[in-house]
Amino acid sequence: VNVTIVGGGLTGLTAAYYLGHAKPEWTITLFEQAPRFGGKIQTQRVDDFVVELGPDSYLGRKTEMTDLVHDLGLGDTLVSNETGQAFVYDKGSIHPIPGGSIMGIPTELMPFVKATLISWPGKLRAGLDYFKKPYQLDKNGDVSIGHFFKYHLGQEMMDKLIEPLLAGIYGGDIYKISLLSTFPHFIQVEQKYGNMVKGMMAAKMSHSKAGVSKAAKDAVAEGDVPRAGKGTMTDRQFESHEAKSSQANFASNSASSSNHVTKTSSNHQSAKAQTDMESRKGTAAQSGMFRQLTGGLESVITAIVEAMPSNVHLHTGTLVSDIRYVDGMYAIDVVNSVNNACGCQSTTDSATEVLLDKAPAIADHVIISTPPATYSQWFKDDAGFDFLRSMEQSSCAIAIMAFDKSTFDGDLKGSGLLITRKTDTPLTACTILNQKWPQTTPDDKVVLRVFIGKPGNDVVERLSEEELSELAVKEIQHIMGFSVKPEWVRINRLIHCMPQYNV
């Protein structure tokens, strides 16, 4: 049996790794267009700094990733984020996020009453949700995030808390983003309790007392996002992006094989991994709900490539230009992604014969782990892919900048801040990395991770990396109130990187 995997990011590599181990008699070939594996995961070493130019962590409750880390022998390098107060910047002022809130939804009276971010009329309007009835969903049981929370909590809460918290995760228009596709548990909570204030209060109480309600756990876990320094490109976006991309797993047999492999991996997790996970349960809630590795997320990519079984053949610099179904098999046209000539660099000693003379690769099954914009073009006559072709994509940029702590004259309270969409800046958030992930930064340095890109603002596509760097420094200096210049800046532009899961 021959299996072809298209895409060498974390999803494609993981599929190859587990499938190769589960089916040693199968031949598995993976094609990656870029000259490197890892996709958006990109870790750089800058002197004594560990710099993440893509996602910087994953949610600890997503145990599949933790299982993989342990399977690769990297369990001892796992660390949790340090928690701290998160803030919101709104039109010239920095305010703490109200205590006792879950994703901006108040669950405790006094912290919300004392909050400086929301005006008294805004607080009273949010409190009226206690008497609200459930929102009337559309025929698909869906509604946009914006319309849902504006109905429950009012315009001011939407603008100052909900939008910077939730819209930033997906980099999109909160009045278009589907609640059912992104935060379905909010609908479940509302339907069960009648409104969001009652529901989130009950969910928090249930979680704190028993810890057995999935809705409560999900709600509280999602509420940890801002406390951990949430930004535009996070594990949540990655997770949804990769999950939606899996719809292109159009060979049904390979899809069922992948499901079997995932279960096999979970069932065969080592006793040591289980023990390690149990030992961390007591401290995870205290130290943060995100996970990182001391060597950066790219250490997972390096380890999984090195640990591939011998029946898996990995190739970089290979572009899949078309996929056709011919006589019960899949024909995959592959060309060199650099000079358009057939050939590739391989991590294995044996070349793949199907690449010779531009002959198509032939496979019994195909697994695709690329963005929708890549694979939807291969199925132009298939109406089932129309929704992918029409899917909007948003862009963002990440700027990492380092300062000497002894000369830094800004306010370093908490883990970071979010920026309201109505504030006149293209920035959406800033994480203080030396306080969120202290192991990534020397003790005498300050590192800021700044996120750029709002709906309707084209600066990420229009400006050069040098211009984006200057813009990010200038804007965050103004917001945080400091004047010192950074020792260095690293920029990563992610053009049309985030599919928009709109209603």
Residue ranges and their predicted role:
Residues 2-29:
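N-terminal Rossmann-like FAD-binding beta1-loop-alpha1 element of flavoenzymes
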